[in-house]
A protein has these predicted regions:
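Bacterial N-terminal signal peptides
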Residues: 4-13
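Glyoxalase I/VOC metalloenzyme domain signal
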Residues: 17-21, 26-45, 63-296
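Histidine-centered divalent-metal-coordination microenvironment in nucleic-acid enzymes
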Residues: 60
């Protein structure tokens, strides 16, 4: 009986262990300041081109594990009506910084069915794309998970229709090798226990590990092997609570995995779930970005 139960849970547990970050998105009203601020922190991005939606353009920093950090902003003279149609319109107009994340899927249709079987709302795949500055055309399909705007609470799902390396590696190699990739997505939530319940339902996760970080001003929860930290404000006066009031439940910070942490200046440090994390100066960067220190 016990063996049968373990076998029945195995697919969900395997999925949770294999949940891979495709990319994370930072939003702003103009691309130049986003690029300049990240470059000043020592992580220069490369321009990736305009999206086919007629409203946004992007730059990116890709990493050796294939994940990348996307800077997304409004195209010059974009039609306000087209901007309104974007799922992250308020982040773009309000310089919201972290706004979304995506999970890489080889079998998008299969994952849609799995989530539906777990009673998680998920949309049918929709095609999209963009053109790189060198005229290379990129195409992909995505599905939204949950009822919130795309990729804010749950990751949205993405599957490439053209070669993924063309999207992730515009220079045919990682843009930055000082970091392994995107290690954690930190999601601001109003009710930590309710958010934990939804993630466990969607991905078959074990009970979380919790801690309090007064420096980050949040109750934190780490769920199994997925690259997610849920963060609930410690108080009504928290910066996190103000962010929730303005942007809703969504990513509030991203954490990179560092290969060469000594090359970068940390404005502050903390320790999450036994791992040391250094934070860039959010006042200078305009949003919160950290990196895990490897324990060699």
């Amino acid at each position: 009986m016990r063996g049968a139960l373990i076998l029945s849970l195995l697919p969900a547990l395997l999925f949770a262990a294999d949940l891979k970050i495709d990319h994370v998105t930072v939003a702003g009203s103009s691309l130049n300041p986003l690029q300049a601020n990240l470059s000043a922190a020592g992580i220069p991005p490369v321009y990736g081109g305009a999206h086919t939606n007629g409203a946004t353009e992007m730059a990116l920093v890709s990493f050796p594990d294939g994940s990348y950090l996307e800077l997304m902003a409004l195209q010059a003279n974009a039609d306000p009506h087209l901007i309104d149609q974007q799922p992250w319109a308020k982040f773009l107009r309000g310089n919201g910084g972290p706004c979304a994340w995506a999970a890489r899927e080889k079998d998008l249709a299969g994952e849609v069915k799995r989530l539906e079987a777990a009673s998680i709302p998920v949309s049918a795949p929709v095609r999209s794309g963009r053109q790189r500055p060198d005229a290379v055309r990129l195409e992909w399909e995505t599905s939204d998970v949950g009822t919130e705007p795309r990729g804010t609470f749950f990751p949205f799902l993405i599957r490439d229709l053209t070669e993924r390396r063309l999207r992730a590696f515009p220079q045919a190699k990682p843009v930055n090798r000082d970091f392994r990739g995107i290690a954690k997505v930190v999601i601001a939530v109003r009710d930590l226990d309710a958010a934990i319940k939804r993630y466990r339902q969607a991905y078959g996760l074990p009970a979380p590990i919790k801690q309090v970080d007064p420096g980050f001003d949040a109750h934190l929860a780490l769920l199994g092997g997925v690259p997610v930290v849920l963060a609930q404000p410690l108080s009504a006066e928290s910066w996190l609570n103000e962010r929730l009031d303005q942007f809703g439940e969504a990513p509030c910070a991203f954490v990179l995995g560092a290969n060469r942490p000594g090359r970068y200046h940390a404005a502050s440090q903390t320790r999450w779930f036994g791992i040391e994390i250094s934070w860039f100066d959010s006042g200078k960067l305009g949003w919160r970005l950290g990196f895990e220190i490897p324990e060699w």
